[in-house]
Amino acid sequence: MKHLFCIGLTLLCLACASDPQKEMEKKIIGEWCNPYTYESTGELKGFSFKKGGVCEAINIPSLDLKTWSIQEGYLLIKGFSLEEDGKKEVYETKEKIDLLNADTLCVVAHEANPRLVFLYLNAKIIKERVRVDTMSHE
C-alpha cells in the first residue's frame, strides 16, 4: 500500500511539473534595462515585456516594438525600427536566453566568434546595483 502511495504521489508530481517555457514567460514579464547605459548616462534604456506578448522599448525612440515571445529557449522580439528619414523598417530579433532570473536577463545575439552577449537588469533593482558614473556627465 505504501509503495502504491509513493508511485501515485510521483505520478501526480510529474503531471503537475511546471513547463520550462511557461516559467521563462512568467519571469521575463517586467522592465529590463542595460546596466552599462545606466552607468554611463544615468538613463534607463531597454525593454518592457508585458503579459500577452506585448513589448515596448524603454527610452529608445528609434524602436517601435510590438510583440515578444519565447520559443525553444529563444527570445523573439518584433516591431519596427524608425530611421532618421522617417522610414519604418521591420525589426525582428531572435536571441538565445543564456540566463533569466528575477534580477538578470542575459541573451546571446551571436554564438560564434566573436560571441555577442547582451546583459539587462530588472529595472526594479538596477538603481540599487549600478552606480552612475557622475564624471562622464560633467
Placement of each model-derived feature along the sequence:
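Sec-dependent N-terminal signal peptides
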Residues: 4-14
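Lipid interaction determinants
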Residues: 16-138
